[in-house]
Amino acid sequence: MADDLYQKGIKKIQELTASADDNPTGFMDIGEAFKDIAPDLTQYVVEFAFAGIYSRPGRDNKQKVLTTITALVAQGKPQIGMHIKTGLTVGLTPEEIIGCIMHLIPYTGFPSVLGALTVAKEVFNEQGITVDTSAFQ
């Protein structure tokens, strides 16, 4: 049963990242970084977050990833870059991602939004993506 749950989580990660790789977009680096003190972290991330939460019905992957990006902006968490990459993979446009981040200014404040925009800009630059700023005028 646990192996089935783990495999379900791995399949969901691969679906979200369009990768057959064993470490798509660095998701597994999280567990690897802490295996000396929390050797079961990867299992929790894969089984709970991806086999459980991300696999729940009712919302498509774009909505789920945009919700995750929103939560990470609000918390000012560094994992936002990984999830921006995932958002692009599941079909979010750069403009949708930037629009979401900008919408959070009155709710999370300028510092968290500026931090998120910095990360988004880095991700877009790495991937050679240009944002259509006319969408915001």
Language model segments and positions:
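Amphipathic alpha-helical interface surfaces
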Residues: 41, 63, 76-83
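Short, structured motif recognition centered on aromatic/hydrophobic residues
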Residues: 63-72, 100-101
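A short structural micro-motif
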Residues: 73-74, 90, 103-110
